[in-house]
């Protein structure tokens, strides 16, 4: 009261006023803080009446009494500022029968409060003293005529007769012998006026209230309230229990007003069936009168209300929702009545309120404007990220996901964004081979499938069983790679080399010149030996030393067949644009008889600057069945620049020509005569795929081209193997 008066600084009158029958002008006004108000302008000569009215409004506080804000004296009169209200005479045409019934009930409560609590009498209960607030409640005004029961003398009544409604004056006051009412019947004057007011409003209920209830209420009005004898008029509190005031709307309103006084069982029963009771009411009545009572902290704290009723109030009706219980309000009413209430609730920092609001944010968030979302909703939602409650943080994150679709990620997330996750469509099904059976593509697919099965299962029975014995690891690895290479070959039907991109370069052309030659498999390059050698100077020429084998028995030499496979070397590095093609013709092995030994070596130039191949006899071992192979030393010169006419990667292509030979695996199981296979020396270049020349008995020469870009290369040696129990003695010479 006092704070409201001191806080008020100014107001602005709006629009044209409404003039009451008593001559009082009512102006709508806007306060300085933006709130709405009403200003009653009295004439200066009525200052005493205004002071009395202001005094009663300040001291009497009831929901059904007009709320006082301030009183000032202006040039045009005395201004009494109250809450924003509208005269009942103006608003009556827009009210429904349920609202009128609730309004009558409000005035009844206000009079009971004056009589029982204040021991006062209003003395002017009529249509012009009743006002309708913005929330639909009826307010009793005209407090300038209020006085205590003993003070209602005939003289006082004559002084206020100018402002009183003639229809509200009881018949006893017309008698010249009237001297006043006893204090025990001080309510009789207001009871008569209230009966007259209700009687004028009853025609509105002709079709809305049952005939029995309406006739019963009319009988009470005429026989009790409008009784000419003041002693026969009962107290107004006796009307509260009449069936006229028992309807769904009024009962819901009364229950919600006294929610804090109800027990848990009463609240559970009420909210459990609230949806059924409210569904029969008009949407306008629900929006104007029930929404403010239902959307508050008290109702949000009731679990039954949150589960059974609020979901139907926190969202508008949807046109296409078959099989679902529709919401209570249309989108237009939801926008005008519910959204303002929700905006205020988002500023309430109570956990249970925020949980309910965010749980149903998808249903109503689209009805906020962009400005409301940015200035009110988003800042309030973001506060939940810093809360200590895990449930608040979790539901806040889900709500932010909803806001992203409306405000955009730049507004919700903020800051610059970068592309982190790429759009990919992985295929989890293998491409089936639909090519013809005899086509080259079909052969390639078959080879790849055969090789992949072996690579995936190295423990399969593809390799000979004698590899699992006491065979050196380097020899076992070489033989396994030969088996891998043989699996990828299909004979003379397909002579194209399968090439795969190396180091990101896929422009490698086919190096097969002879269509009848055996195809070169795409073997995996061998791993480098574990020994370390000092780097050799770059300018040294490359040389290959072929060491002759020791003489063996005739029986052993007849069954000895050293085979190797042809391997294509591809250099995957494209940073060097040079190529040096070197050819080496290897002579066929010469049979050794028991009468002596002969050594032959073919000297083949590898490059223009390379030295001839030199052969030197090897030292015999102490044991007859062992042989010694000296690791050759190979050095390369720095590659020269090749002509610029070659394509990308062609300078690293190694071309090999050879005649087709029979499957080398057939010789491995030729007979069971124990023998010692002489070692074969293979040239291993780093990062290149190797192909081993397979000499036959007819002294077939092969052509091998390789790149000499590296300064030093390593050599691997083929190991000799024999029957189980035989040992081989190895000596490292000339390192």
UniProtKB/Swiss-Prot annotation:
Keywords, sorted A to Z: Cell projection, Cytoplasm, Golgi apparatus, Lipoprotein, Myristate, Phosphoprotein, Repeat
One MF term in the entry's GO annotations: identical protein binding
Matches recorded under PROSITE patterns: PROTEIN_KINASE_DOM
Entry comment on modification after translation: May be myristoylated; myristoylation may target it to Golgi compartment.
Location of the protein in the cell: Cytoplasm; Golgi apparatus; Cell projection, Lamellipodium
N-terminal signal peptide: none
GO biological process: inflammatory response; neuron development; protein localization; spinal cord motor neuron differentiation
InterPro entries: ARM-like (IPR011989), ARM-type_fold (IPR016024), CIK-Related_Protein (IPR051177), Kinase-like_dom_sf (IPR011009), Prot_kinase_dom (IPR000719)
Lipidation (N-myristoyl glycine): 2
Residue span, Protein kinase domain: 2-245
Residue numbers bearing the Phosphoserine modification: 439, 701
Cellular component GO terms held in the UniProt record: cytosol; endoplasmic reticulum; Golgi apparatus; Golgi membrane; lamellipodium
Biased composition (Acidic residues): 528-538
Highest taxon of source: Eukaryota
Function (record text): May play a role in regulating cell adhesion/migration complexes in migrating cells.
Name of the protein: Protein-associating with the carboxyl-terminal domain of ezrin
């Amino acid at each position: 009261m006092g704070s409201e008066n001191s806080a008020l600084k100014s107001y602005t009158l709006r629009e044209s006023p409404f003039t009451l029958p008593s001559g009082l002008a009512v102006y709508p006004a806007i306060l300085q803080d933006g709130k709405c108000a009403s200003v009653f302008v009295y004439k200066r000569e009525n200052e005493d009446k205004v002071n009395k009215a202001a005094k009663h409004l300040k001291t009497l506080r009831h929901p059904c009494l007009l709320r006082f804000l301030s009183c000032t004296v202006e040039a045009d009169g005395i201004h009494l500022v109250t809450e924003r209200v509208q005269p009942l005479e103006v608003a009556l045409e827009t009210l429904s029968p349920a609202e009128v019934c609730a309004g009558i009930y409000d005035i009844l409560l206000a009079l009971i409060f004056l009589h029982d609590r204040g021991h006062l009498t209003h003395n002017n209960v009529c249509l012009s003293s009743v006002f309708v607030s913005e929330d639909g409640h009826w307010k009793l005004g005209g407090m300038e005529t209020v006085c205590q029961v003993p003070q209602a003398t005939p003289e006082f009544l004559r002084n206020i007769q100018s402002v009183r409604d003639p229809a509200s004056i009881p018949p006893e006051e017309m008698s010249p012998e009237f001297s006043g009412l006893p204090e025990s019947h001080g309510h009789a004057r207001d009871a008569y006026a209230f009966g007259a007011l209700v009687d004028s409003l009853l025609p509105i209920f002709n079709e809305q209230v049952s005939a029995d209830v309406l006739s019963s209420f009319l009988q009470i009005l005429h026989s009790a309230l409008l009784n000419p004898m003041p002693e026969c008029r009962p107290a107004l509190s006796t009307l509260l229990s009449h069936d006229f005031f028992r309807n769904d709307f009024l009962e819901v309103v009364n229950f919600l007003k006294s929610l804090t006084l109800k027990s848990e069982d009463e609240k559970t029963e009420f909210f459990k069936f609230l949806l059924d009771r409210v569904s029969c009411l008009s949407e306008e009545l629900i929006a104007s009168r029930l929404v403010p009572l239902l959307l508050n902290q008290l109702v949000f704290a009731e679990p039954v209300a949150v589960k059974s009723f609020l979901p139907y109030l926190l969202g508008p009706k949807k046109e296409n929702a078959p099989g679902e219980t529709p919401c209570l309000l249309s989108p237009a009413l939801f926008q005008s009545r519910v959204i303002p209430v929700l905006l205020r609730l988002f500023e309430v920092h109570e956990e249970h309120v925020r949980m309910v609001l965010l749980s149903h944010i998808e249903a109503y968030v689209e009805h906020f404007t962009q400005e409301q979302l940015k200035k009110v909703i988003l800042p309030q939602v973001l506060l939940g990220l810093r809360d200590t409650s895990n449930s608040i943080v979790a539901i806040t994150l889900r709500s932010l996901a909803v806001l992203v679709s409306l405000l955009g990620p730049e507004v919700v997330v903020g800051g610059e964004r970068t592309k982190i996750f790429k759009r990919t469509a992985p295929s989890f099904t293998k491409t089936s081979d639909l090519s013809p059976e005899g086509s080259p593509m079909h052969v390639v697919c078959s080879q790849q499938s055969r090789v992949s099965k072996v690579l995936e299962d190295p423990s399969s029975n593809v390799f000979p069983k004698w590899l699992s014995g006491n065979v050196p690891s380097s020899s076992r690895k070489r033989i396994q790679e030969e088996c891998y290479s043989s699996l990828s070959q299909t004979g003379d039907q397909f002579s194209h080399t399968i090439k795969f991109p190396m180091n990101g370069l896929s422009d490698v052309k086919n190096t097969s010149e002879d269509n009848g030659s055996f195809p070169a498999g795409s073997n995996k390059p061998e791993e480098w030996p574990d020994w370390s050698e000092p780097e050799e100077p770059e300018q040294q020429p490359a040389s290959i030393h072929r060491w002759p084998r020791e003489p063996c028995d005739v029986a052993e030499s007849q069954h000895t067949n050293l085979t190797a496979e042809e391997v294509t070397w591809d250099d995957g590095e494209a940073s060097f644009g040079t190529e040096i093609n070197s050819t080496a013709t290897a002579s066929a092995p010469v049979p050794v008889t028991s009468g002596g030994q002969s050594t032959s070596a073919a000297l083949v130039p590898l490059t223009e600057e390379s030295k001839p191949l030199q052969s030197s006899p090897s030292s015999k071992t102490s044991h007859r069945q062992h042989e010694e192979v000296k690791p050759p030393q190979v050095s390369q010169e720095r590659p020269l620049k090749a002509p610029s006419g070659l394509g990308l990667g062609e300078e690293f292509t190694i071309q090999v020509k050879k005649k087709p030979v029979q499957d080398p695996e057939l010789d491995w199981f030729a007979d069971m005569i124990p023998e010692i296979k002489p070692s074969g020396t293979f040239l291993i270049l780093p990062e290149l795929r190797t192909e081993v020349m397979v000499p036959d008995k007819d002294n077939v020469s092969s052509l091998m081209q390789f790149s000499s870009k590296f300064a030093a290369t390593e050599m691997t040696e083929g190991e000799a193997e024999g029957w189980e129990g035989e040992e081989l003695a190895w000596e490292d010479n000339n390192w």
